[in-house]
């Protein structure tokens, strides 16, 4: 890059960090870090009616959790570019002076149309099978007509006037050459609302220009905004930044843009966090939504992704959200981590108490809970997809004596003679009762098999059922180690009594 790269992630605080917003933030982050540039966090809060409490804080918190940091923003102001919230920038008059410049040039004008008049215009266009567009009714009106409207108490919006038959073009990093004609853009558009707040399309241009933004990476749903923004750049005599419109994330079931109404997919980064997805895995997964490096490899650390990132490998096609791929990827990260690291992260989830499963484990003393988690992870590290499953397993083991097992799975089963089942159970019970504190459970089970002459399914199915309630289980001696010796003996005794009765 010849110029010093400056990119921005500019969310609206109208909700929490959505997977689509996270994708946009992540690609801006990779771009900035790969090209040794500057990442700016800007808050676009002009839509005051839709802003939600803690929306901005949620954005920052979840970006940090993902591993995305920024160089400038509300909490890291550069005096040259601050402030970083559009509401604050509006109070300082940053936008209005450029609005006034366009008014003075005759490129912008005041529109006193009422909502009723605009609705009537749209209905008429619909009846005539015309595409919806503003008909320019207030363009070129005299000062007298404007004063007459104001005398009626009407407050104007300010519209940008498109020249006739003018092409707005740009070379998009992801999509190549893109062109729109001014006659097909819906007519003159509002750049300042009647309450004095600039609209998105105007504020974003002023902000990107005055903050020296060099590259704009954003979702493909913004493509229709880009010609309007280029029109403003041209009218103010400014050079526009380089655009890159990244693929939208689609639901593979509906084959449409992922919607907050799609209940089959977790929508917000905070939800992934509380379900026990690792931030490294989410970062890796999102990086592959609409982009891919050279080769077949899929597991990359953040540092590796920064190194190999090439924006020219951005896809034009939608990115389909593959839940199975995410679960697989998260499982790979779980398998690669140490038991101590996974224990610490699972403990964090429990302390945060964002799920009912996590809240239940908060009643266990921390030292005891830590030991329970370590042993649970040792057993299940190879077969869980997310840490919430570790929490669920841990609770199941902690409350094992409160559960009822269905011993009929083996009782009077023609494949398992009752006397053989009892021989296995009683044999292991005796070894537990008579063994030392450091008894090797794996060796004890082997000795029971040798003593009884029972092996394979005949040996392990009864023990699996006794200790887990299922004939299928991981290494049973590791599960026995999760319980106390007394609990192991009681679980064996319960099944023995069930078979003897």
UniProtKB/Swiss-Prot annotation:
Lineage per the UniProt record: Bacteria, Bacillati, Bacillota, Bacilli, Lactobacillales
A GO molecular function held by the record: glutamate-tRNA ligase activity
Keyword Protein transport: no
Annotated PANTHER family: GLUTAMATE--TRNA LIGASE, GLUTAMATE--TRNA LIGASE, MITOCHONDRIAL-RELATED
NCBIfam families hit by this protein: gltX_bact
Known partners and oligomeric status: Monomer.
Listed GO biological process terms: glutamyl-tRNA aminoacylation
Superkingdom to which the source organism belongs: Bacteria
Record field: catalytic activity: tRNA(Glu) + L-glutamate + ATP = L-glutamyl-tRNA(Glu) + AMP + diphosphate
Name of the protein in its database record: Glutamate--tRNA ligase
Motif 'HIGH' region, chain ranges: 11-21
Source organism (scientific name): Limosilactobacillus reuteri (strain DSM 20016)
Alphabetical keyword list: Aminoacyl-tRNA synthetase, ATP-binding, Cytoplasm, Ligase, Nucleotide-binding, Protein biosynthesis
Motif 'KMSKS' region positions after renumbering to this chain: 257-261
Enzyme Commission code(s) on record: 6.1.1.17
């Amino acid at each position: 890059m010849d110029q010093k790269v400056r990119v921005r992630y500019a969310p609206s605080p109208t909700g929490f960090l959505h997977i689509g917003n996270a994708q946009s933030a992540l690609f801006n982050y990779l771009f900035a870090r790969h090209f040794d540039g500057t990442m700016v966090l800007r808050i676009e809060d002009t839509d005051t009616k839709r802003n939600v409490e803690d929306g901005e804080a949620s954005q920052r918190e979840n970006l940090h959790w993902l591993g995305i940091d920024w160089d400038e923003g509300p909490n890291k102001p550069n005096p040259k570019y601050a402030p970083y919230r559009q509401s604050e920038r509006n109070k300082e008059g940053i936008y209005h002076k450029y609005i006034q410049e366009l008014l003075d040039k005759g490129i912008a004008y005041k529109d006193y149309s009422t909502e009723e008049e605009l609705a009537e215009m749209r209905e008429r266009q619909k009846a005539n099978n015309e595409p919806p567009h503003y008909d320019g009714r207030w363009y070129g009106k005299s000062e007298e007509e404007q004063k007459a409207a104001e005398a009626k108490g009407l407050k104007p919006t300010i519209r940008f006037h498109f020249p006739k038959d003018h092409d707005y073009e740009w070379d998009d990093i992801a999509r190549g050459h893109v062109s729109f004609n001014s006659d097909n853009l819906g007519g003159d558009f509002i750049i300042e609302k009647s309450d004095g707040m600039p609209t998105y399309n105007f504020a974003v241009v002023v902000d990107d220009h005055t903050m020296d933004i060099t590259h704009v990476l954003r979702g493909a749903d913004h493509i229709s905004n880009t010609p309007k923004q280029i029109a403003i750049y041209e009218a103010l005599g400014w050079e526009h930044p380089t655009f890159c419109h990244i693929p939208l994330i689609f639901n593979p079931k509906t084959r449409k843009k992922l919607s907050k109404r799609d209940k089959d997919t977790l929508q917000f980064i905070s939800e992934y966090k509380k379900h026990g997805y690792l931030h490294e895995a989410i970062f890796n997964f999102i990086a592959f939504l609409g982009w891919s490096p050279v080769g077949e490899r899929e597991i990359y650390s953040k540092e590796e992704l920064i190194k190999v990132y090439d924006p020219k490998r951005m896809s034009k096609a939608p990115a389909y959200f593959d839940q199975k791929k995410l679960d697989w990827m998260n499982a790979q990260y779980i398998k690669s981590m140490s038991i101590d690291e996974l224990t610490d992260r699972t403990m964090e989830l429990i302390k945060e108490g964002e799920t009912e499963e996590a809240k239940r484990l908060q009643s266990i003393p921390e030292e005891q809970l830590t030991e329970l988690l370590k042993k649970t992870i040792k057993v299940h590290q190879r077969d869980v997809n997310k840490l919430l499953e570790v929490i669920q397993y841990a609770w199941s083991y902690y409350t094992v004596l409160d559960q009822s097992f269905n011993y009929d799975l083996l009782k009077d089963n023609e494949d398992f003679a009752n006397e053989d089942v009892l021989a296995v159970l009683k044999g292991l019970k005796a070894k537990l009762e008579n063994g030392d504190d450091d008894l090797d459970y794996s060796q004890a089970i082997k000795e029971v098999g040798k003593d009884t002459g029972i092996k394979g399914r005949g040996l392990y199915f009864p023990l699996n059922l006794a200790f887990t309630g299922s004939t299928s289980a991981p290494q049973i001696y590791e599960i026995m180690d999760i319980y106390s010796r007394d609990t192991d003996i009681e679980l064996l005794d319960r099944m023995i009594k069930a078979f003897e009765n």
